[in-house]
Amino acid sequence: MQGCRQRESNKICTRDGPGGMLTARGLAVFRAERLVFRDLDFSLVPATLRPAGEGAPDAVTLIGPNGSGKSTLLRLLAGFVRPAVGTVWWQEEPLPADPADRARIVTYIGHQDAVKPGLTAAENLLFDASWHPRGRRREAILNALEAVGLSALSALPGRMLSAGQKRRLALSRLMLRETPVWLLDEPTLGLDDASIALFGDMLRAHRARGGVVMAATHVPLPLPGAGVLSLHPHALAAQTGQAAIEGAGDEWAGDEWG
């Protein structure tokens, strides 16, 4: 991971100032009365805006043990959690606090699939399809289902889908929303190799269009060239809640994955 600078407590690849597409400075978050992390900086810059291999990445994977703040960070960026301190910028302006405005920028896929059992696969996508003109919604839904290999199951009720099919249905929402920022929590949970390959195609196309990705995971993801942001509570965390956060390059971080 290139373009790093080091702070007193943490280090992560950044750009000076809010110059990236998605940039955070000095983030700290509490869960109840416990400090989850602090002094967290990062930048995500689309590949279309930087020379190849230079500067901040367009994708970052979040790794670390359970409870280290991976999901909390994603939920913060999605607007569901407020930071105790710190700022997040979107194209040199503070990320909008209004949910409707933020939803035009980020799509968040949590670790739960949010599939309604009484609705068909296609009907489960109606809300996300509302971002499209009314006359194009059916086509948009069918295209999204095709992208994740669920075209043949469009009329099947959610309760009849397997765990992997429900996960693919959740990921198809990315194709409907078409936002520049994807926030993904354990996106490949329950997916087989063929489904992961389809998801990899989605990620490549998104990044090629200038999109950026932040994903929490315990397993390798199809995100070649992504940076790694490690959240590791240590002895100090037991006293202050501080997390050790480190930019770790493009290689797997050894035993940290598991």
Swiss-Prot record:
KW Membrane (keyword) present: yes
UniProt subcellular location: Cell inner membrane
Residue ranges of every copy of the ABC transporter domain listed in the record: 30-257
EC class: translocase
Family the entry assigns: Belongs to the ABC transporter superfamily. CcmA exporter (TC 3.A.1.107) family.
Complexes and interactors: The complex is composed of two ATP-binding proteins (CcmA) and two transmembrane proteins (CcmB).
GO cellular component, one term: plasma membrane
E.C. code: 7.6.2.5
Organism of this sequence: Granulibacter bethesdensis (strain ATCC BAA-1260 / CGDNIH1)
Binding site residues for ATP: G64, P65, N66, G67, S68, G69, K70, S71
Name of the protein this chain belongs to: Cytochrome c biogenesis ATP-binding export protein CcmA
Gene that encodes it: ccmA
PANTHER family reported for this sequence: ABC TRANSPORTER I FAMILY MEMBER 1
Domain of life: Bacteria
Reaction equation(s) it catalyzes: heme b(in) + ATP + H2O = heme b(out) + ADP + phosphate + H(+)
SS bond partners: none
Any one GO BP annotation for this protein: cytochrome complex assembly
Function: Part of the ABC transporter complex CcmAB involved in the biogenesis of c-type cytochromes; once thought to export heme, this seems not to be the case, but its exact role is uncertain. Responsible for energy coupling to the transport system.
Membrane-protein topology: Peripheral membrane protein
Xref: Gene3D superfamilies: P-loop containing nucleotide triphosphate hydrolases (3.40.50.300)
Keyword Flavoprotein: no
